[in-house]
Amino acid sequence: MTIAESSQKSATRKPDSMEPILRLNNIEKSLQDTRDYRGLQLENGLKVLLISDPNTDVSAAALSVQVGHMSDPTNLPGLAHFCEHMLFLGTEKYPHENGYTTYLSQSGGSSNAATYPLMTKYHFHVAPDKLDGALDRFAQFFIAPLFTPSATEREINAVNSEHEKNLPSDLWRIKQVNRHLAKPDHAYSKFGSGNKTTLSEIPKSKNIDVRDELLKFHKQWYSANIMCLAVIGKESLDELEGMVLEKFSEIENKNVKVPGWPRHPYAEERYGQKVKIVPIKDIRSLTISFTTDDLTQFYKSGPDNYLTHLIGHEGKGSILSELRRLGWCNDLMAGHQNTQNGFGFFDIVVDLTQEGLEHVDDIVKIVFQYLEMLRKEGPKKWIFDECVKLNEMRFRFKEKEQPENLVTHAVSSMQIFPLEEVLIAPYLSNEWRPDLIKGLLDELVPSKSRIVIVSQSFEPDCDLAEPYYKTKYGITRVAKDTVQSWENCELNENLKLALPNSFIPTNFDISDVPADAPKHPTIILDTPILRVWHKQDNQFNKPKACMTFDMSNPIAYLDPLNCNLNHMMVMLLKDQLNEYLYDAELASLKLSVMGKSCGIDFTIRGFSDKQVVLLEKLLDHLFDFSIDEKRFDILKEEYVRSLKNFKAEQPYQHSIYYLALLLTENAWANMELLDAMELVTYDRVLNFAKEFFQRLHTECFIFGNVTKQQATDIAGRVNTRLEATNASKLPILARQMLKKREYKLLAGDSYLFEKENEFHKSSCAQLYLQCGAQTDHTNIMVNLVSQVLSEPCYDCLRTKEQLGYIVFSGVRKVNGANGIRIIVQSAKHPSYVEDRIENFLQTYLQVIEDMPLDEFERHKEALAVKKLEKPKTIFQQFSQFYGEIAMQTYHFEREEAEVAILRKISKADFVDYFKKFIAKDGEERRVLSVHIVSQQTDENATSEAEPVEITNMERHKPISDIVTFKSCKELYPIALPFLDIKAKGARSKL
């Protein structure tokens, strides 16, 4: 930890009237943090964090205002959220509705915002030399927004579309039931999203002018004294200070008092109740919720963090360990959430098995047995000290945050913590206060708990409905004798305190990097059964590393049955390792295990000190694979539910899924996997695992604080295990591990695939324009098309035409092929939506042809900025390198090569490409359109919808059978490697 040094005052200081009333140069930061920080408070009360990073390739800013949807007027639910939407749509100084987003888009940036119960946050990122202009536009949100009548009327549709997107989301539904059950006069009970009914229809019926209410809300609450701003740029602190003073001093200080809610949200009768909720998806969960006082002031002692650490622990002796042993649960989470303004919740959430659902009272009792054990044991200083040590270690070696993430996190922390502690405060719980731990523990008792259970099996018993989402729920009181058994529970001998964490690293030395160290990953071992890549980090200078192992066996994706067996093997492996891995994860050492079409992939990342210990444990499990039959049954049922639940995912996700199913060479459909699950047995998984691990090819990449000698030693450990199998006798051939390929559409092709959906009100249209095989030139050209189209597409289809909340345009780059896709999720029929997409493309062709040369060059530069943005962390650099290795392309300087081509693209080249591949009658145009059609009808509709004219569907050839479609299509070639490296695996002797 160190103190940011004071900087000298700039010679071009603003007049004294523009001086801040407070300037702090003692912002506590991590020892290795090279950025400079300064805190300010302006005369209008605005708190500011300035971050100077001369080497940044992205600038960013965020602003939080400490008002959210809990401050909505009672007669206008959703007004705070609506206000957030409207600020993007024009200000007095910059009146064009899309002026802000256009500026950002042409400057390599983008923006977003979110409304929370107590806070609203706005943020953006942009090319460094465009920060000044972006800040000027951003500041006007909070000074003089327009709220034009036209935009107000239209944007209500976007808010409503966002709400309709969330209607089938169990997360939103359950949250709103909990709010609905709060005291009706408490702000926590409000409906924060808003919809057309609450923001248009009801207000109109009561002669309420919503635009006037928006203006009043902004005027009342958007006050500088409850705002926090964070800015990061390449400029000096003095230069950044000058920019902020000039642009943000105009925000009015209305001396707003931050709203607070010291009363708890639930009436006394709500405690001791069981709330049963019927979900859309087949999920089962139990939540034990305790309402607490606001604990924000105790951030330096963190009593909630101490209890969260123990109650949510996953090692031996934990609640989760005991519930898994009994077969009642798969997962458990615990944590405290402060409102920061009066109250909070301590929640324990249990993911239930089918058997667990029948033992809810027993599970709750086990939780209270654990809490009773904690009371009897009392707070332990050594456990607290271990948590302090972990936090100090995380802060000391904190990775460099992405600029936009940094400022977005900062403006939240600035609302809570002193400015000088804004960076360190989340890691600062180092004051030992056992009295606070005991006090909080005394609040976690049966008489102060709410029990919420979620399961589809409750449908017959639930006769109540939440008004906004229509979620069915029911309420019963917990029997008195049950409550008494919880209150007077005996200790459970299986529940114990966590043991000391053996994974906490002790060696933080950075290995010396040889002067002749290669710039890119190189192969240090290559045999028919094992290929090892290595690159020692010489950039981030942290005691961290990443290593990944890609284990391939062609049996993994042979058919839907084997695909399921592979998936089950991975699930069981992760399940077996869970207790052991939890301590490692607490010590910032993470293992991820993933199934993939060619087998499994596992990655270890974090502090380099104990990685080999974790690797050895993993190898033991891999090559001596065993299965607990009870856990097999539980995990099989969980996997089947996940396959069935796919049908309730968002329509846009379905459109993406079906496009991949249509174009990928070999892809098993969800229904094919579901049918094959009937054949998945305990013995089959066991036999599959034995066969899989007996004949493998493994590709490994080791990156970070690892020398070549250390990497060679790791390779030797893996090789020893592989040589003990049959892999060395009969290795996997290179041609058994060829990458998947993409089906090729021909010039002039235009196909339509249509699928019905009964779970969502919204439909979805995806227009996919295939653009050819991946090459540096094609890659950068489709990226440039995406760059130029993105903002105007959003502005036209979402902001102006209000087709729906989800509007996306971008590149689809998979399986060696490139393309552009436009996705719109809408209440309107996909055929109509596609017609509007085509109309936009046709209209925009003329815009591109008439585009001034300087505007086209701005787009090129914006794309170059995005492409050349450097990885900020070891893991990001590792992922970039490994992406090339996994795809077997080895083009480690791809971004630089593509940008070199980009610099040479003329406007005429671009217009010609757009006309050929994107425009409606382009000679090279290849279209595959996917429509997801809602089968729901609008229950609130008072008249039949007006018919809309659809002009472009007759040119599509419908796809009625996926197999038939694929049977008559060629495949694109696999992208060839950039470097002359032979394909991994054994060479054929033919």
Swiss-Prot record:
It holds the Pfam family Peptidase_M16_M. Binds 1 zinc ion per subunit. Induction: Inhibited by bacitracin and sulfhydryl-specific reagents. Optimum temperature is 37 degrees Celsius. It catalyses: Degradation of insulin, glucagon and other polypeptides. No action on proteins. It is an enzyme of class 3 (hydrolase). Zn(2+) binds at residues 81, 85, 162. GO terms for cellular component: cytoplasm; cytosol; mitochondrion; peroxisome; plasma membrane. The active site is at 84 (proton acceptor). Keywords: Hydrolase, Metal-binding, Metalloprotease, Protease, Zinc. InterPro entries: Metalloenz_LuxS/M16, Pept_M16_N, Pept_M16_Zn_BS, Peptidase_M16, Peptidase_M16_C, Peptidase_M16_M. GO terms for biological process: defense response to Gram-negative bacterium; determination of adult lifespan; insulin catabolic process; negative regulation of developmental growth; negative regulation of growth; negative regulation of insulin receptor signaling pathway; peptide catabolic process; positive regulation of innate immune response. Optimum pH is 7-8. Its cofactor is Zn(2+). Its EC number is 3.4.24.56. GO terms for molecular function: metal ion binding; metalloendopeptidase activity; metallopeptidase activity. Can cleave insulin and TGF-alpha. Belongs to the peptidase M16 family. This is Insulin-degrading enzyme. It comes from Drosophila melanogaster (Fruit fly). The gene is Ide.
